[in-house]
Amino acid sequence: MHIKCACLLFFLNAYQYLQTATRLKTGSPECSFDHVFQYAKLIQKMKKSKKKLRVGVVGTGYLGKFHAEKYARMDDVDLVGIADINKSQAEKIAKKYSVKAYTSHKDILDKIDAVSIVVPTPAHYKVSRDFLEHDVDVLIEKPMTTTLEEADKLIQFAEARGLIIQVGHLERFNPAVIALRDYVKKPLFIESHRLSTYKERATDVSVVLDLMIHDIDIISNFVRSKVESIHAAGIGVISKHVDIANARLEFENGCVANVTASRISTRDERKIRLFQRDAYISVDFANHGITIVKKSNKDKSSIIPGMDINKLCFNKGDALDDELKSFVKAVKKRVSPEVTGQVGRSALKIALSIMQQIQNRNRSYFV
């Protein structure tokens, strides 16, 4: 009798988890008993939502060390271990937070519930897949992968097992970007400039996948329309990949975006301007400020006649801390993350199309 009750409870719990999983934007698995056993294994994660989440960090480069720092400070997180093929670097960061260091990510597959994957982009797919196969939820630094095929495989695998994929589009958590939601209404023209001085650490991919993809994600989030056509140009000046690029994106709803990114600039700049009916909005990401210029019928002097100018400033905040806390919340509550795998894939698709345009142009130009 006890065995029958236990079996019934097992299946009911599994069924309940399936219903919860269907609410995740990362996927909607079919509610069939063929899936029960693999989902039942994840029930424990839901039951442990009030306990500390066991987290790991793979990759201790420039960004990885900050991921470790943020997790170590969270009261509801247990930073279990840090992995990096560079043994001395892994040990250095691990010692700082009194956790174990590993030279292979495979050594922590069975020790954690969630992981930040902060390795070079070409390794994103393989490392992420290994963790997903062990029922570990993943936060993958942007770009999600190097190809759409890899992104699709990760998304499909996560969907089938009710797992969470969050992509690290950090600017989503910038206070200025969050504030934009209250002011941006159907923009018709957008222009962005993301310029950076040269840094060797980010040259394993093109500037399109390294920097421009931030603005691609932001613009796509506000335009909410499919890209109809792309015209792009770019060239590698210092590295073997494209170091400076410009793209004109035309959306189905009529909006046009002119996007520029460079990692060989003499200065750092991260700005975007959005033009819409009766107003335009200028955002300085680096200084966390927004300038809103709106049409006005008020009879008063202004720098621009007939226009009101309002400037908003925001505290710098900690976008990475907010991003990681959002990931932890999504994992513990089993809810959709702020930037799902599908969202990361959408930005990647546009970025790869831009890269293809650049390659085609350069192939015909440098003959």
Feature roles, as predicted:
Residues 21-23, 28-49, 114-117, 326-367:
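C-terminal helix-rich "cap/oligomerization" subdomain common to oxidoreductases
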Residues 170, 276-342, 346, 363-367:
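C-terminal glycine/acidic-rich active-site capping loop/insertion
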Residues 67, 97-155:
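Beta-loop-alpha module in the N-terminal Rossmann-like domain of NAD(P)-dependent dehydrogenases
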Residues 5-7, 31:
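Cysteine-centered motifs
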Residues 168-175, 198-227, 343-344:
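Mid-domain beta-loop-alpha active-site segment that forms a flexible
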